[in-house]
């Protein structure tokens, strides 16, 4: 398969942006439960800005493979049956929550609404981060299912397509998170680097499984 470069840029940039946000929220979640030192708001704000920039660049790349970009908004109207329509809806929702998450950290406005029995605070960034976490995985699923639901492309018509989107996007994002932590939050760099290695290995396993599966596919028809 040889997809257009715009599709490659779209999926790579947006997937990395999703993964970077997940890395940031992983650190904040660990810190909330006392498993890591509390990090500066600048770490989360700058990381969110980078994730948001990747999402914007991916969105820009998506317009290059649209025949009529000015009609792109209409694709959201088929959300009941189309994974592309669902992606068009979930992507801006995810971008919006990532933006608010980053701005909340940047402004230092983070009121606490309640506490869990463990003592972990339920604050504004925890709420926004949880919403963005849901949107991030929903977006991975929507993007993967755009290709995994195509029966005539047997190489993609498999749950492995969705799994690989999640793993490879997560590997890219956690690697970026580890690089950012090396500069702004050295205390959490080993955690993010470790997760990046684990997810990358799982991505290798998933991709290898896909290649093995595709190699065993038999054509349904021949020229003979």
Language model features with spans:
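Hydrophobic/aromatic pocket-lining and membrane-interface residues
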Residues: 22, 65, 176
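Membrane helical hairpin/interfacial module
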Residues: 26, 36-97
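N-terminal signal-anchor module of multipass membrane proteins
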Residues: 1-54
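Long, contiguous internal "core" modules enriched in hydrophobic/ aromatic residues
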Residues: 10-16, 32, 79-83, 89-224
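Hydrophobic, membrane-facing alpha-helical anchors
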Residues: 1, 5, 46-52, 68-74, ...
């Amino acid at each position: 398969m040889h997809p257009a470069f715009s599709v490659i840029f779209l999926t790579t940039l947006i997937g990395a942006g999703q993964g970077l946000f997940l890395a940031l929220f992983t650190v904040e979640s660990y810190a909330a439960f006392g498993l890591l030192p509390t990090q500066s708001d600048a770490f989360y704000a700058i990381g969110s800005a980078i994730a948001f920039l990747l999402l914007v660049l991916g969105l820009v790349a998506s317009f290059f493979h649209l025949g009529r970009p000015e009609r792109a908004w209409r694709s959201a109207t088929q959300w009941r049956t189309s994974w592309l329509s669902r992606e068009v809806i979930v992507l801006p929702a995810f971008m919006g929550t990532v933006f608010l998450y980053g701005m909340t950290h940047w402004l230092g406005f983070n009121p606490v609404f309640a506490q869990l029995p463990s003592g972990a605070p339920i604050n504004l960034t925890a709420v926004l981060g949880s919403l963005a976490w849901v949107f991030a995985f929903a977006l991975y699923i929507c993007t993967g299912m755009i290709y995994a639901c195509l029966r005539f492309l047997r190489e993609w018509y498999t749950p492995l397509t969705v799994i690989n989107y999640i793993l490879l996007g997560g590997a890219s994002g956690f690697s970026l998170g580890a690089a950012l932590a090396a500069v702004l939050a050295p205390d959490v760099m080993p955690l993010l680097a470790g997760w990046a290695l684990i997810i990358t290995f799982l991505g290798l396993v998933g991709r290898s499984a896909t290649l093995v599966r595709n190699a065993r596919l038999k054509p349904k028809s021949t020229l003979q």
